[in-house]
């Protein structure tokens, strides 16, 4: 039958029934970000003014951003969480997750005007521009979960590492804010014993930390970001997870859309330039003379006939 309001209501009620009010997200572990559900709920809120829909989105976006599923040092979102609290992720990073999570945060910012969500957008687009963009302008597909044969090794930290890099005072601040434990909070996959390493994560926002200490939030965030920069510079020296450097037409369309929408909503010319360069790349390297698209490109070679999702998502990006 035809799609009508009752179908939208049914979808909303199903999501609300499955919502985790304590940790955000839907259902039990493993938990995926499912940003498309959040975008639906934002549209449902705009249509119905049902504040429950908006609160579900805000809670979920904040809890994900504060969790270990989010790369607190280098930004970007990992693929999913193996627990209910978003603490321990499967450390792989997928391009489409970045695009969809940007879209959900951007739309939430447009509804709420809360800069918390626009800052998340800026962080993820910074990550994609820095680590997931080819010199030609296309976006790479993914980064692996493991390096040196260990999942997450690139992303986890020992407490003494933080102390050596940041010094005693700054280390105390970082370890407290990001919930480090002396024995570690990252468990060995088979034995479930503590490994001595930590996944940085938050239990409350950086602004809430500042308020609790009677500090000005903007200055507090600036201080924390300076610590991130030191740790990021140190982390760059580690053996990096392997990058899947294929450029896929459909995922690039999603990312072009995320950059271009963010450019308009946040008035950021640099995001528009990134989107334009990626779009030009796709139309130059992934479009045949007869106008038909190809699905993938890697190291100068494009191939495979495109599918419907390639046309749909690249069209979305170009629009």
How would you label these PLM feature ranges?
Residues 1-254, 258, 262-265, 297:
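Replace the tail clause
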Residues 247-319:
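Long, K/E/R/D-enriched contiguous segments that form extended
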